[in-house]
Amino acid sequence: MIRHAFFAGLLGLATASSAWAADMIEKTSPHSVAETIDRLEAAVEAAGATVFARVDHAAGAANVDMELRPTQMLMFGNPKLGTPAMLDGQTAGLDLPLRVLAYENGEGTVHVTYHDPASFAAAHGLPGDAKYIQMMTGALDKLTTAATAAE
């Protein structure tokens, strides 16, 4: 009995992990991680949004004598979009401001990854067809496309 419950639990975790991964949108970048995040930051600021934080995970790892391939996260947002989401479901603050991760994989390819706003809308009981979700989705696509453009 316990054995069946254990395997059912593992299956549930695997399914949840797969669903969470399916809700991530990923693009590749021809630029380094640092340049990709620089370009993203410039695009965010040009769009009139606010950059709240830039986290260099590899630098953090180096501070504790560990090595991590280049990995940086940019946290940004616009209260005109985030506030209505939080008014509909205050727990949306766990996923806001928006975050985009750029990292270099073992083969040297730079990836840009972010969560699809529709997935966190569902997680926080927000209406999936809300205008702010559509606007966040469009903004993330536009901003990450600018950051990963070959130009």
Describe these PLM feature segments.
Residues 1-2:
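N-terminal secretory signal peptides that target proteins for export/translocation
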Residues 5-16:
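Bacterial N-terminal signal peptides
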Residues 19-48, 145-149:
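Terminal, regulation- and interaction-focused segments at domain boundaries
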Residues 30-35, 52, 127-134:
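Soluble non-cytosolic domains of exported or imported proteins
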Residues 36, 40, 57, 132, ...:
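Stable alpha-helical elements in mature extracytoplasmic
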Residues 45, 49-52, 56-98, 102:
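Compact, glycine-rich, soluble single-domain proteins
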Residues 99-126:
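Beta-strand/loop substructures that line and gate deep hydrophobic ligand-binding cavities in soluble
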Residues 118-151:
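C-terminal partner/receptor-binding element of secreted or periplasmic proteins
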